[in-house]
Amino acid sequence: MILMIDNYDSFTYNLVQALEAAGANVRVLRNDAIDRAGLEAMADDPAAELRGIVVSPGPGDPDSAGVSMDAVRVAVERRIPLLGVCLGMQAMGAALGATIRRAPTLVHGEASSVRHDGKGLLAGMPTPFMAARYHSLSVAPETLPADVIVTARTEDDYVVMGIRHLSAPIEGVQFHPESVLTPEGPHLLANFLRLAGEGEASLLDRASGSFALAGFATEPSAAGAPNRPDRPIEPRTAAAAGAGRAEIVR
């Protein structure tokens, strides 16, 4: 079973629909419908068959995202595969001690060119690829702890688009893999299902490059952004203080 933490977002059920199309059993809980103790009990209950967690996009910031940050902490402690999407990635960063700050530009429904390291959930995806963005906050990379790395950035303004924990099976992406503006998004979701051991990931692999035709999401398409010269994904590393509430720089 994949647990979807719904941060009251319209994109949540696009994610659910895509995962279910690949045969995954998805249970959706609003971010205020369960607490950390409930997550721990679910993780420890063999009958629940919890194989992975997705923390959905949503409005606001990590501190207003209910159980989202605790979901990240439980996933790290229990080694449960977790994917954070948009606000979900910000919750991942904040839970692990990073600062969440204003993005250089507010982006709503635009496609950006994203370059990545080709590992983890990004394995097998072209670089760069076009990805949908809807956000005004971003993870400050210099505040990530040493065991969390940047995996993807936009080519134009170099905003962090992906992070990965080095010792736990959790990753976050700032872009929306479930959007028709991210044609390669199904492959990322397929990689997550493979990591979690849930569903038939190959069904999503076949949709890669034609997400709109597969019928998983419905936004209009957008023009692509120009490519930029190759740059490293991770320009520097820095340790951060322990996790608590999210530090939001406004």
Question: What feature does the model see in each segment?
Answer:
Residues M42, E49-G124, P128, L189:
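Cysteine-nucleophile active-site neighborhood
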Residues C86, H135, H176:
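Histidine-centered divalent metal-coordination motifs
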Residues M1-I80, P183, A190-R250:
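N-terminal beta1-alpha1 cap of cysteine-dependent amidohydrolase-like domains
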Residues V26-V28, I100, V150:
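Generic structural signal for residues in well-ordered beta-strands
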Residues R153-G199:
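A glycine-centered loop/beta-turn motif at secondary-structure junctions
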Residues G120-A168:
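Catalytic beta-strand/loop cores that center a nucleophilic Ser/Cys/Thr
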Residues M1, N25, R51, P81-L83, ...:
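Structural signature of beta-strand start/N-cap positions in the alpha/beta core
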Residues V28-I34, S112-R115, A131-Y134, R153-D156:
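Short gly/ser/thr-rich secondary-structure transition/capping motifs
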